Regions:
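Rossmann-like AdoMet
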Residues: 1-83, 87-148, 307-310, 316, ...
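A residue-level signal for conserved active-site and pocket-lining positions in enzyme catalytic cores
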Residues: 27, 152, 288
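Conserved protein kinase catalytic core
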Residues: 88, 121, 161-162, 246
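Short amphipathic alpha-helical segments
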Residues: 95, 125-126, 163-167, 249-251
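Short, glycine/acidic-enriched loop or turn micro-motifs at the edges of active sites
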Residues: 118, 158, 243
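Conserved acidic residues
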Residues: 149-150, 234
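A mobile, often basic/glycine-rich helix-loop segment
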Residues: 151-199, 252-261
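Long, Lys/Arg- and hydrophobic-enriched amphipathic alpha-helices
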Residues: 199-372
Length: 372
């Protein structure tokens, strides 16, 4: 058993079964043994994100952020808050490109990289040391209490927020708890731990079939509510894999969407090696829109990562893909990396981009150009 498994087993022995949300929270965020408390190299061995593919991802995002700044009237300080910033790769790509290609925007830019792990905050600070010294970058454990004007964004963060597991059993919605028996973690079915789960599904008008499983992302709802309150004027941009509720809870997802990732392999062995594998569940974008509206946010639009990146790159024929002095071979390699980001069989159609706003008016964003 892993060290975290020992701790969780002892907790269950003493106090009884725990919700899967509690189990997932400990597996991912325990300050010592949690998966995301480890170095970024452990994470990279299990999966990679769009940031890892090519710097053009950050460069095109920088262009979108710069346009947002323009729409806000070019405020003297534009607070760009990245939630779940990790070791700061994306921050470095956005900052470096803004400094070299978007100088007016860069002068107004205050980039805050929010990350729970102290080791990763230190890595992020080191990676953007020049921008720290120039007063354009800071790493923080918490989201700023106020964001007067700016954008708060995340890339593959919400899929890793803890979820409650549920199952329709004998015509009633039950919760799947985590128990420990016969020296292993097992499912334990019981009544819902909180009425908020019932409200979550009722809000979407979901009708489950017998034995259908689903995840309730209550923490994602709390997250969008809180960041919506802290944002005074600007945008919230969410990039993640998931669906709107009608698709997320249909009969194509009878077993839910929860997966464990280890060594680039996806499995449903959630209880294997607690703290040493990633756990994710698809994002419910309808919930983000619904709870966001309650916090004063308005949906600007939602599109695929493919459409988003292509719309942003169309203006200069994706010239941001290449570095000065690149050889033909290096340029060809960069084009192949771009395909991973935008082609349907790569990341392009699996990932969705949701943009919400508060107090910005109705100006069109380039990344959402062409959507209905």
């Amino acid at each position: 058993m892993t060290p975290l498994a020992e701790l969780l087993a002892e907790r269950i022995r003493r106090f009884g079964p725990i919700t899967f949300a509690d189990f997932m929270r400990e597996c991912l965020y325990h300050p010592i043994h949690g998966y995301y408390s480890k170095t970024e190299f452990t994470r990279f061995a299990d999966y990679y994100t769009s940031v890892d593919v090519h710097p053009i991802f950050g460069r095109l995002l920088a262009r979108q952020f710069s346009e947002m700044w323009e729409h806000l009237g070019r405020p003297s300080e534009f607070m760009l808050v990245e939630c779940g910033a990790g070791a700061g790769r994306l921050a470095a790509h956005v900052l470096d490109f803004s400094e070299s290609q978007l100088s007016d925007f860069y002068e107004a830019l205050c980039y805050v990289a929010v990350e729970r792990s102290s080791a990763r905050r230190e890595q992020a600070t080191g990676r953007s040391k020049r921008h720290v010294e120039a007063g354009h970058f800071a790493a923080s454990i918490e989201i700023p209490a106020r964001i007067p004007a700016g954008c708060l964004f995340s890339n593959e963060l919400l899929d890793a927020l803890p979820v409650h597991r549920t199952v329709m059993q004998d015509g009633a919605l039950k919760e799947v708890f985590v128990n420990f028996a016969n020296d292993r973690f097992v499912d334990s079915i019981a009544p819902l731990s909180t009425c908020a789960i019932q409200e979550y599904f009722a809000t979407h008008g979901v009708a489950f079939q017998e034995s259908q499983q689903a995840e309730a992302g209550l923490e994602a709802c709390d997250w969008i509510t809180e960041v919506g309150r802290r944002l005074e004027r600007g945008y919230i941009l969410t990039i993640d894999y998931g669906h709107r509720a009608a698709e997320l809870f249909d009969d194509h997802h009878m077993r839910g969407t929860l997966l464990a990732y280890q060594n680039h392999r996806a499995t449903e062995n959630y209880y294997t090696s607690p703290g040493e594998q990633d756990l994710t569940a698809h994002v419910n974008f309808t919930a983000l829109e619904t709870w966001g509206k309650r916090a004063g946010l308005e949906t600007v639009g939602m599109t695929s990562q493919t459409s988003f990146l292509l719309a942003l790159g169309r203006g200069n024929e994706l010239a941001d893909l290449h570095e000065p002095g690149q050889t033909e071979l290096e340029q060809a390699r960069a084009r192949l990396q771009l395909k991973t980001l935008i082609y349907p069989e790569g990341m392009g159609e699996r990932f969705q981009v949701l943009i919400q706003q508060k107090g910005t008016g109705s100006a069109q964003l380039t990344g959402l150009a062409g959507i209905a």
